[in-house]
């Protein structure tokens, strides 16, 4: 599976590293040079060609994150949006792409993992999600 990670900052570098460590074919796009095990592209996430990606993980700053999704929403892509945006998901009606909108690490991704565990293992009596700190430490 070919995954394009857009943005290699605090969250982006963490997510990219975890995906590489899990054995995925990961390409990291950023406008700042980054040290990474992924195949690195010094390029704008907005202007790069992502047509060969199976999944796009949008982790650019929220101030431009909505622009990335808006440009890709009609290209038949599968997009996971981890950038915080003040835009609402109603703009994703009648589009050609699948968008998991404003997922975030926690509570977004963590809640999806709890739901997956519940489906796999049955009723969960208790779930604790601890949030905070630097994910790279």
Regions of interest found by a model, annotated:
Residues 19:
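Aromatic pocket-lining residues of Rossmann-like dinucleotide-binding sites
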Residues 74-77, 97:
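A short helix->loop->beta-strand "cap" motif at the edges of active sites that frequently abuts
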Residues 11:
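Hydrophobic/small residue at the entry helix of a nucleotide-binding pocket
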Residues 24-37:
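NAD(P)-binding Rossmann-fold cofactor-contacting core
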Residues 116-137:
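Conserved anion/nucleotide-ligand pocket segment
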Residues 3-7:
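Conserved N-terminal Rossmann-fold NAD(P)-binding element of oxidoreductases
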Residues 82-101:
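Rossmann-fold NAD(P)-binding glycine/threonine-rich loop
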Residues 55-71, 87:
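Beta-loop-alpha module in the N-terminal Rossmann-like domain of NAD(P)-dependent dehydrogenases
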């Amino acid at each position: 599976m070919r995954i394009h990670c857009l943005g290699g900052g605090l969250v982006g570098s963490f997510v990219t590293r975890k995906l590489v460590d899990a054995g995925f074919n990961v390409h990291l796009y950023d406008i700042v040079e980054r040290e990474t095990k992924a195949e690195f592209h010094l390029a704008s996430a907005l202007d790069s060609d992502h047509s060969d990606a199976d999944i796009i993980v949008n982790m650019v700053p929220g101030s431009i994150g909505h622009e990335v999704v808006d440009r890709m929403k009609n290209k038949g892509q599968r997009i996971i949006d981890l950038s915080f945006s003040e835009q609402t998901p109603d703009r994703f009606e009648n589009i050609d792409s699948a968008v998991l909108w404003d997922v975030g690490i926690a509570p977004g991704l963590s809640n999806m993992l709890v739901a997956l565990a519940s489906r796999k293992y049955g009723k969960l009596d208790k779930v604790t999600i601890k949030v905070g700190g630097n994910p790279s430490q």
